[in-house]
C-alpha cells in the first residue's frame, strides 16, 4: 500500500459515512486486505456500499469474499484489474476459473459495475 499508516485504510472508517450519507454510492477499491471480514460486514449492513477487487488477482481473493459473492453479495463486488498493474489477459481467465455460478460471474465481471457507475439495475 501507499506509505501512510495502515489504520487509515481500515474500512471501518466508512461505517459513519454510510450512516450519515445513505444516498451516497461508495466503493472500497483495491480490496480490503487485511480487513476483508470487516469489509464484508459493512457490505451486508449498507445498501449503498460496494467493493472493487482492483489490483487483486482473482485467484488470490479470500474464500470469505468468494462465499459472500455466492450468497448475500451477488450484487456488491465489482471486478477491476487495475491495469497496468494486472493485465486483462491474466485476470479475466482467473476470474472465469473462480467456480462462481454464471449469474454471480456475470454480475462480478460486468453487471455490478454497470449498476454502480451508470445506475442500470440488472437481474
Question: Model-found features: residue ranges?
Answer:
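Catalytic pocket-lining loop regions of alpha/beta-barrel enzymes
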Residues: 1-78
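Acidic-enriched, low-complexity/disordered segments with a strong bias for Aspartate over Glutamate
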Residues: 15, 33, 37, 82, ...
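Mid-to-C-terminal alpha-helical segments outside catalytic/metal-binding sites
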Residues: 73-76, 86-123
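Conserved, mostly hydrophobic/aromatic
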Residues: 30, 51, 82, 105, ...
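Short amphipathic alpha-helical interaction segments
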Residues: 56-60, 69, 83-87, 97-100
Amino acid at each position: 500500500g501507499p506509505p501512510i499508516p495502515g489504520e487509515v485504510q481500515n474500512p471501518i472508517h466508512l461505517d459513519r459515512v454510510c450512516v450519515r450519507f445513505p444516498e451516497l454510492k461508495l466503493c472500497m477499491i483495491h480490496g480490503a486486505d487485511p480487513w476483508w471480514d470487516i469489509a464484508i460486514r459493512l457490505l451486508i449492513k449498507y445498501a449503498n456500499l460496494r467493493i472493487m477487487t482492483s489490483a487483486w488477482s482473482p485467484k488470490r481473493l479470500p474464500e470469505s469474499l468468494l462465499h459472500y459473492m455466492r450468497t448475500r453479495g451477488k450484487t456488491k463486488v465489482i471486478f477491476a484489474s487495475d491495469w497496468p498493474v494486472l493485465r486483462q489477459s491474466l485476470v479475466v481467465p482467473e476470474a472465469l476459473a473462480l467456480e462462481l455460478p454464471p449469474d454471480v460471474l456475470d454480475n462480478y465481471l460486468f453487471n455490478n459495475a454497470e449498476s454502480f457507475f451508470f445506475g442500470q439495475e440488472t437481474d
